[in-house]
UniProtKB/Swiss-Prot annotation:
Gene3D superfamilies: Knottin, scorpion toxin-like (3.30.30.10). This is Toxin Ct28. It is found in: Secreted. Blocks voltage-gated potassium channels. Has the structural arrangement of an alpha-helix connected to a beta-sheet by disulfide bonds (CSalpha/beta). The keyword Thylakoid does not apply. Residues 1-22 form the signal peptide. Coiled coil: none annotated.
Length: 62
C-alpha cells in the first residue's frame, strides 16, 4: 500500500510540472487579446495566452 501512495505522489508531481509549461514574454499588455498573436507565433496555433502584471504569459497547449 505504501508503494501505491508513493507512485501516486510521483504522478501528481509530474503532472504539475507538465501543466505549468508557461513562458513570460517581453510584450506589454492590458488584455489577453494583445498576447494571443505573439504567443501563437511562439508556440503555434494551440497556444494559450494571459496578460499578467502587464506582461504576456504564454501557455503551450499542444
Amino acid at each position: 500500500m505504501k508503494a501505491f501512495y508513493g507512485i501516486l505522489i510521483i504522478l501528481l508531481f509530474c503532472s504539475m510540472f507538465k501543466l505549468n509549461e508557461s513562458t513570460t514574454i517581453n510584450v506589454k499588455c492590458t488584455s489577453p487579446k494583445q498576447c494571443l498573436k505573439p504567443c501563437k507565433d511562439l508556440y503555434g496555433p494551440h497556444a494559450g495566452a494571459k496578460c499578467m502584471n502587464g506582461k504576456c504569459k504564454c501557455y503551450n497547449n499542444g
